[in-house]
Regions:
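Alpha-helical propensity feature that highlights long, continuous alpha-helices across diverse contexts
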Residues: 1-182
């Protein structure tokens, strides 16, 4: 998949967690809804996403690309495949994806994302430490999922956002979900 999708992954993170001035939880849903008519909102958000992507260091760009790489695994777990869409933007049926996620399945996917993130950071040379340090590659959240749930339950929301926003990121990049044959 292309960097356009990784750009939206980064934009979601910046809008939800990194930049307080951008703070808006459903930014990708809003962007998707304004996409079809190329409204001023969509154009502004797209430029903002591109600007934030251009400022991002290459290792963090790769972190976004790696997250995208896991999408096919998440989708297969739910019985979906990913394909190029004939429509622009691709149609999203929320009832097909997010609305039907049982709590146990969401928990499984969130846990998978957490372990994917831990592995990505560890392979890149990061180590667990009490304080985050980008120079020495240290991060306090490199820990097992069950420990994260106990010590930092608010952080689990980031992993859940990866799952909830997956269809929007794919649609904005011109991809769609389809039900795999049983």
């Amino acid at each position: 998949m292309q960097d356009k999708l990784a750009l939206y992954v980064n934009y979601l993170y910046d809008c939800c967690y990194a930049d307080e001035s951008l703070k808006q939880k459903e930014v990708l849903k809003k962007m998707y809804e304004s996409y079809g008519n190329h409204s001023a909102d969509f154009i502004l958000m797209n430029h903002q996403a591109q600007y934030l992507w251009n400022k991002l260091s290459e290792p963090l760009r790769w972190a976004n690309r790696y997250q995208l790489d896991a999408y096919s695994v998440f989708c297969r777990t739910l019985g979906y495949g990913i394909r190029r869409s004939d429509h622009s933007p691709a149609h999203i049926s929320e009832s097909m994806f997010n609305e039907d996620l049982p709590a146990q399945v969401l928990y499984l996917l969130v846990r998978m994302e957490k372990y994917r993130w831990n592995a990505e950071r560890t392979v890149a040379g990061w180590k667990r430490a009490k304080v985050k340090d980008k120079v020495f590659l240290q991060h306090p959240l490199i820990m097992p999922f069950c420990e994260l749930l106990q010590k930092h339950p608010e952080e689990v929301e980031k992993d859940a956002d990866v799952i909830y926003n997956l269809p929007y990121i794919l649609a904005l990049g011109g991809y769609e979900l389809y039900r795999l044959a049983d």
